[in-house]
Amino acid sequence: YKFVSKMLDGYANVLEVGCGDGFGGTLVADTVEHLVGMDFDPLFIENATNLRTESDNRSFIVHDILEAPLKNRFDAAYSLDVLEHISKEEESLFMENILGSLDDNGTLIIGMPSLESQDYASIQSKIGHINCKSGDELKTFCKNYFHNVFIFSMNDEVVHTGFTPMAHYLLALCTNPTKG
């Protein structure tokens, strides 16, 4: 979330796809004008809404991105720890609906555990992580939807541009959508 908050600093209208309880979005909300947290689980959205403060620049909505894009358009979107839970059969729909929710010049950041990190993941994590990717696979996937894709690696809290097979976590910064 620190990386996202720095990369999207100053953006006006940002969407978090798969916000869960909204906890991580508080860092991003500090650097953007308005943050919309979206999740398919009504319980998550209820909890996130209850944690808001009066001065909070966030709102939350229940929506399944696999069903349709949002009607509103956003300058940027981010989705952390979501794509690895989306089946390969539905990953294109996931990206197309995010793209359909972005302005023509929208930016997207996707974060996920690396494929290589799964050798060290718990059994519970492995069960839910049905679509982890290597750095090269994530870049290739994102290049289907964006002209510019920059892959960053992360180990602990250190973000770098180093050798992705040694990364525990991957971040894809995607700009200049291929749509429209």
Task: Show where each model-derived region lies.
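Conserved SAM-binding loop of SAM-dependent methyltransferases across substrates and taxa
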Residues: 21-32
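Conserved alpha-helix/loop element of class I SAM-dependent methyltransferases that forms part
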Residues: 1-12
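Conserved acidic residues
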Residues: 12, 33, 75
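A short helix->loop->beta-strand "cap" motif at the edges of active sites that frequently abuts
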Residues: 32-33, 106
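S-adenosyl-L-methionine-dependent methyltransferase catalytic module, highlighting the catalytic core
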Residues: 23, 40-47, 51, 60-67, ...
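Conserved SAM-binding motif I beta-strand of class I
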Residues: 34-39
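Glycine-rich phosphate-binding loop signature in dinucleotide/nucleotide-binding domains
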Residues: 70-72
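Conserved class I S-adenosyl-L-methionine
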Residues: 11-20
